[in-house]
């Protein structure tokens, strides 16, 4: 099997439109098995292509974990490539990255038995992520930031590509600020029973029946994890490219795919959110936002960023109040 580094640009260019079609088929197919969750599924696909963590926020029973499980199933992912865990303040590192190998310890080496744990997974789902204690927090930050963990004091790469996390609430504690900042996008999973009572009953009943019968009709072989990895690699090649125009000038990704009027609108909205709502947007987050805009534009329309892609600014909140406020304000700023 080829690694990501072995996929040449020419091959990815030839496959790009087919890959995009397959991912969109998965996106629309999954939406059929949920009530009013298309927004979340779209963001899951964008985050997965960009390889940026996504935080699902909402009360219990709003399909957060079910969305991730069905997404994993739809990819046809092997169990060895998937890890999920519900965190508590009592969670120990061994539950996440593996127990200490006693035999190795007798020989003076501090080695963890990582098989079946987070360090071997390519898709990870962490429920109640903000319940992390300080030991877990440090491990997660190293894995998210640097894609590595430590064995016997030496860094070892992890294959993590997609990270989804869920929380019932977004805490205010300062020690969690670094972890929160790693989730550029935070999306609400809202209860739908008030407006979609009948649809919820019908969909929920079908879901219970599928589980009882061990059926997974959402597994329709539309897209695989490799499709998402190839999409990421293809877009990364584009981000790195500098092209010469017919008049000999250099044209980078922004000049080619981000029209000046849309870019100016991006700047205007960011400045408005910082000035009027005191939203903190780090320099790192701005760069990641650009990447996410481009991924969304490529997935939904094939390339050029439009004003509709700027809706991702609605998911920047660092607290539940900010998440709620931006959900209302950003569409207004966009004139939607």
Task: List the model feature ranges, each with a label.
Residues 5-9, 58, 267-336:
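C-terminal engagement/docking regions of AAA+ P-loop ATPases
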Residues 9-23, 33-34, 187-279, 302-303:
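Conserved C-terminal "switch" segment of AAA+ ATPases
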Residues 15-59:
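Pre-Walker A (pre-P-loop) alpha-helix and adjacent loop at the N terminus of AAA/AAA+ ATPase modules
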Residues 36, 44, 56, 96, ...:
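Conserved RecA-like P-loop NTPase ATPase core
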Residues 43-46, 102-124:
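Conserved alpha-helical scaffold flanking the Walker A/P-loop in AAA+ ATPase domains
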Residues 45-88:
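Walker A/P-loop
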Residues 88-107:
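Conserved NTP-binding/hydrolysis module of P-loop NTPases
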Residues 103-109, 123-232:
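Canonical AAA+ ATPase core
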């Amino acid at each position: 099997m080829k690694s990501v580094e072995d996929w040449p640009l020419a091959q990815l260019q030839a496959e790009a439109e087919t890959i995009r079609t397959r991912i969109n088929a998965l996106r629309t197919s999954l939406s059929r098995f949920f009530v009013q969750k298309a927004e979340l599924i779209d963001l899951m696909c964008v985050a997965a292509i960009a390889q940026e963590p996504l935080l699902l926020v909402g009360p219990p029973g709003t399909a957060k974990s079910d969305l991730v499980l069905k997404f994993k199933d739809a990819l046809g992912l092997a169990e060895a490539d998937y890890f999920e865990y519900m965190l508590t303040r009592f969670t120990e590192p061994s539950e996440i990255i593996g127990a200490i190998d006693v035999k190795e310890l007798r020989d003076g080496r501090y080695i963890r038995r990582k098989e079946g744990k987070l360090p071997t997974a390519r898709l990870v789902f962490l429920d109640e992520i903000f319940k992390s204690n300080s030991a877990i927090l440090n491990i997660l930050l190293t894995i998210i930031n640097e894609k590595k963990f430590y064995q016997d004091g030496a860094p070892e790469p992890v294959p993590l590509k997609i990270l989804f996390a869920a929380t019932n609430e977004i805490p205010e504690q300062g020690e969690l600020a670094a972890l929160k900042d790693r989730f550029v996008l935070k999306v609400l999973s809202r209860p739908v029973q008030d407006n979609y009572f009948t649809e919820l009953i019908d969909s929920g009943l079908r879901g219970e029946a599928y589980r009882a019968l061990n059926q997974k009709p959402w597994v329709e072989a539309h897209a695989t994890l490799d499709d998402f990895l190839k999409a990421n690699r293809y877009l990364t090649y584009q981000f790195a490219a500098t092209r010469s125009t017919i008049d000999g000038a250099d044209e980078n990704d922004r000049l080619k795919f981000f029209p000046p009027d849309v870019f100016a609108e991006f700047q205007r909205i960011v400045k408005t959110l910082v000035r009027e709502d005191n939203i903190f947007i780090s320099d790192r987050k701005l760069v990641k936002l650009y990447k996410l805009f481009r991924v969304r534009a490529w997935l939904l329309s094939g390339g050029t960023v439009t004003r509709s892609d700027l809706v991702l600014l609605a998911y920047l909140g660092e607290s539940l109040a900010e998440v709620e406020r931006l959900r209302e304000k950003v569409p207004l700023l966009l004139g939607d």
